[in-house]
Amino acid sequence: MKSLLSILMTTVVLSPIAVAQGPGHSPARDLETTDMGAQQLNTIGVSVDRDLQFTDERGYPFTLQQLFPGKQPVVLMLGYYSCPAMCGQVLEAAFYALGRTDLQPGTDYRILRVSIDPNETPEIAANRKAAFLVKLLKTNGEDSWRVLVGDAENTSALAEQVGFQYYWSEATKQFAHPPSLIFLTPEGKVSRVIVNSYFEPDDVRLALVEASQGTLGDFWDKVKLNCLTFDPRTNSYSLAVMTLMRIG
């Protein structure tokens, strides 16, 4: 049993979690939006409303019933397409991490980007998708990820369900909101939330494996999830010492 403990310790300690730093990495985080993001950590297990109505980038009606229940986990990103500040940096960091998970959008997971600005149009969403997102991540088919707009009622309802707090600042003429990735199970339940302006590829991979409920991941992913716990203070998976001691 001691040898098993040694193997697990070696595997976890040598894991590249919290080592690779992608674009947009910055230790300094906005305190206000970080505090806003803390609310998201209380929504684990909450189901999103499948009847919420949006419009996709092609101008077609879209409800969350078109995603849930499904066969793959979903990465939900809330923000807005015309954001002049943080959103672009966060998206770049997210796609950098997703692109290094060895998991494929469309095949292994799906991506959902929803605007919190009720004034944004499908045309804005389509232009943003074409100009920015496609350059950052290869996708397997048009439906592997969707970009949506919606009215204030539906977007605010979705945001509230996943604990995503935001407000319009008259001072800056921008929406203030936390930078985050929200991982949903194939049934549409919040499985994990990472609140940060950068994302480690191994953390993102483990969050996807965790959200998949057993359909994704290899043996070592499962070992890591048994030996690591998600630490909301660091927004990262870290060594669960008590678990290892029990194994030993």
PLM region descriptions:
Residues 47-49, 69-73, 106-111, 142, ...:
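Extracytoplasmic
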